[in-house]
Amino acid sequence: MAGFEFYGEGPPGVDLEELTGKLIVLEGTDGVGRSTQIALLKPWLENHGHAVLVTGMTRSALAGDGIKRAKEGHTLSGSTMSLFYATDFADRLENEMIPALRAGFVVLTDRYIYTLMARSIVRGADPDWIRKVYAFALRPHVVYYLRTQIEHLIPRVLHSTGFDFWESGADLRLGETMYDSFVEYQTRLLKQFDAMTEPFNFEVIGASKSIEQVFEDLQTRITSHLE
């Protein structure tokens, strides 16, 4: 992709020709290692002369804290949470990503609209509706889909944060235990990500490899996109 374009109608007043930076997305299920790789990529890119902005879900000034409080209460419906996340994304797009891209930054984002769409669909949202919700999003230059099997995710999650209520799909009552619910929920998310791979041009990276091997793979691929 030479320049930027929106999936549908973008925010008003944005001149795409002014966006000279690069938008790079790391996607994948919970516990796959996205945040670890972004923490490695940021200083690597900076050492190679690139200004870098890192962003991710629930980090907007407008909606980030509200989403975290809503998740603690477990009371909002799936569609309401979907729109809450869309608000967070829209705020970050307008006030973080677009200004950084206009200034020539490399924007590294830990998940993008694909996670938000996948989660919404798994929770019963109509796929066409949720895609229209995010039609204002910029098409990234590249999306790296870190993919691994469920059996590799479980030990990673257990050794980091443990089973989270939302990341285990506990609100959907998919299993008798948090473990069973996590396995079923993440399996459904994997199915959605796999279905998005071709239409959204994901580059699939096997995330079952070591952190160093995945990082080297990303370095090689990103270098080719920045040349």
Task: Give residue spans per PLM region.
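Walker A (P-loop) phosphate-binding motif
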Residues: 16-43
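A glycine- and Lys/Arg-enriched "phosphate-lid" helix/loop adjacent to the NTP-binding pocket
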Residues: 116-188
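Conserved nucleotide-binding/hydrolysis micro-motifs of P-loop NTPases
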Residues: 59-61, 113-114, 148-154, 211
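NTP-dependent small-molecule kinase module
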Residues: 2-17, 42, 158-227
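Hydrophobic residues at beta-strand termini and immediately following loops
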Residues: 55, 146, 205
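Hydrophobic "anchor" residues on beta-strands that sit immediately upstream
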Residues: 23-26, 106, 143
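ATP-dependent small-molecule kinase phosphotransfer cores
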Residues: 48-138
